[in-house]
């Protein structure tokens, strides 16, 4: 039977629903039967794992209407950037010795993880710039006006550059010494 319901995600930023860039056609599970789902154990970007049953897709949208001030956004993403830098360093240097067990989380989740793995192998700083160009120019984010620019710039370039700056800072202080990197991250 049906254990979970998925919806199409729509993003709003600065009070405007964004229609371009990379915000469309993402399916997310937000409703599920008690005991039939659990969140993955990850530092960030956790996904819901459906333990048993089918997932039905609703025709309605879930609107992620971000109402944070720019100060709140900056604080939140600074914290996220530290965690993402740690995850990327772990992937590069195998710091924790843990290995992510591949499970079927759905095509969307697996596709996004494959994209993140490709992104992680690109050169620092250039990848953030390229990601912004992809979102804002190629995927037509500029058609969403000032709100689209702010979303793509802050979330797509500024945040990604901050992650790379944190990685750069750690590598500058520690080199490629796994032990030093682990100490730095504590």
Regions found by a protein language model. Give the residues of each.
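C-terminal-biased regions
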Residues: 176-177, 186
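Catalytic-site signature of metal-activated, phosphate-bearing donor transferases
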Residues: 1-171, 180-184
């Amino acid at each position: 039977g049906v254990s979970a319901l998925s919806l199409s995600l729509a993003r709003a930023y600065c009070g405007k629903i964004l229609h371009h860039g990379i915000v469309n056609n993402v399916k997310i599970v937000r409703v599920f039967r008690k005991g039939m789902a659990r969140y993955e154990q990850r530092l960030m970007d956790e996904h819901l794992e459906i333990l048993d049953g089918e997932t039905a897709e609703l025709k309605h949208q879930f609107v992620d209407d971000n109402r944070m001030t720019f100060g709140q956004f900056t604080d939140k993403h600074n914290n996220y950037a530290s965690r993402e830098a740690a995850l990327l360093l772990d992937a590069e240097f195998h710091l924790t010795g843990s290995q992510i067990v591949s499970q079927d989380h759905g095509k969307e989740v697996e596709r996004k993880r494959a994209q993140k793995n490709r992104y992680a192998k690109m050169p620092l700083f250039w990848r953030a710039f390229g990601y912004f160009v992809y979102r804002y120019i190629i995927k037509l984010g500029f058609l969403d006006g000032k709100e689209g620019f702010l979303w793509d710039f802050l979330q797509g370039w500024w945040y990604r550059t901050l992650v790379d700056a944190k990685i750069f800072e750690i590598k500058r202080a520690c080199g490629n010494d796994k032990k030093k990197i682990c100490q730095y991250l504590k």
